[in-house]
Regions:
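AAA+/SF3 P-loop NTPase mechanochemical coupling elements
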Residues: 132-143, 147, 155-161, 172-191, ...
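Conserved post-Walker A coupling segment in P-loop NTPases
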Residues: 62-128, 139-155, 220-225
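Conserved RecA-like P-loop NTPase ATPase core
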Residues: 59, 81, 104, 118, ...
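Nucleotide-binding/hydrolysis machinery
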Residues: 52-55, 96-99, 175-185, 193-298
Length: 353
């Protein structure tokens, strides 16, 4: 910046050359980090996450606080809710941001290779082993963060060895006798109910309590209705907005269950980008068949639990409505639909007519 005095008014002029230089330096830094860490770099930041809904705002608020610590974090949520995006954001907001971010997906690595991938191996450890051996993912993540994705798919034998690594903070390569100290921050993730797996004898309780120091639960997309259209705008790079759809299409999108969560929403955006007509709004016939089929079959929107309803609307209101809907001994409804609508409208509550 440069200061300039004009008739007693001081202004500041941005030197675009300096801005361009700063951007170039940032780009070079990213490239150098990518080369230094062999591609193990976190790609996402908190600013990349859509937080138009209160549920996600709460999760991200907690995640920002945890980023400043070295605590182990367990991220839970359905498949496609963005667990790796959140893990990357935590890493990039931490003091380890310029260090490696290494992801290990237990569901993607074959069982016979997972130990050598995680912990590395020495030369001659097995047939086909590389000369001079190979560092494992834990060694590659030294001073940085290791993201243990789909940890619920790890076998019991791998869980036992993983527990020791997390507790002792050291690894032993396959075929070696010496240990290597490591300094890593651990973020684990799963779309499975680990407590249920413990009851079934498929997951170690000691490992569960070791990784579940702090838990962040990502909400499914069906509980983030306010974020659906902002996400569509983000995925389409601003080319598709809520105003691009007919009211019919908006209703279908907002009441759909989204079992594939963010992945399915991104797929829909790609589909619409090809199928849409530039001259008119996007209607039902330009949506993917899975979504329109659910609507044509009288698809029922996700039904929240009683606890969720009470949390959102308050116990007194919910109890009163339940009393209004209560049936008498003859099975007849005590109050009509119009009675209930009048009750809501009298209290200036939004309702569908």
């Amino acid at each position: 910046f440069a200061s300039v005095e004009l008739s007693g008014i001081t202004t500041r002029i941005v030197r675009f050359r300096d801005v361009n230089r700063a951007q170039a330096n940032d780009s070079n830094m990213r490239r150098l980090l990518y080369q230094k860490h062999k591609g193990h770099v976190a790609k996402y930041h908190f600013e990349n996450l859509c937080m138009a809904d209160s549920a996600m705002q709460k999760v991200v608020g907690t995640a920002r606080s945890l980023a400043a610590t070295n605590y182990t974090i367990l991220i839970t949520g359905e498949s496609g809710t963005g667990k790796e995006l959140l893990a990357s954001s935590i890493h990039n907001a931490s003091a380890r941001a310029n260090c490696p971010f290494v992801a290990a997906n237990f569901a993607a690595i074959p069982e016979n290779l997972i130990e050598s991938e995680l912990f590395g191996y020495e030369e001659g450890a097995f047939t086909g082993a590389k000369k001079h051996g190979k560092a494992g993912l834990f060694e590659l993540a030294h001073t940085g963060t290791i993201f243990l994705d789909e940890i619920g798919d790890a076998s019991l034998s791998v869980q036992a060895r993983l527990l020791r690594v997390l507790e002792e903070k050291e690894v032993m390569r396959v075929g070696d006798t010496k240990v290597t100290p490591i300094d890593v921050r651990v973020i684990a993730a799963t779309n499975k109910d680990l407590r249920e797996l413990i009851r079934q004898g498929q997951f170690r309780s000691d490992l569960y309590f070791r990784i579940n120091v702090f838990q962040l639960m990502l909400p499914p997309l069906r509980e983030r209705t306010e974020s659906i259209f902002p996400l569509i705008g983000s995925f389409s790079r601003g080319k598709i907005a809520r105003e691009s759809f007919t009211e019919n299409a908006i209703h279908i999108i907002e009441t759909y269950d989204w079992p594939g969560n963010l992945r399915e929403l991104r797929n829909m955006v790609d589909y619409i980008s090809i199928m849409r007509s530039r001259k008119k709004k996007i209607d039902e016939d330009q949506l993917p068949i899975d979504i329109t089929a659910a609507a044509s079959q009288g698809y029922q929107p996700y039904c929240p639990s009683m606890e969720q309803v009470i949390s959102r609307f308050g116990r007194p209101l919910v109890q009163t409505l339940l009393e209004l809907l209560a049936q008498n001994k003859d099975g007849e409804i005590r109050y009509s639909r119009s009675d209930i609508l009048q009750y809501l409208q009298a209290r200036k509550l939004r309702c569908s007519t």
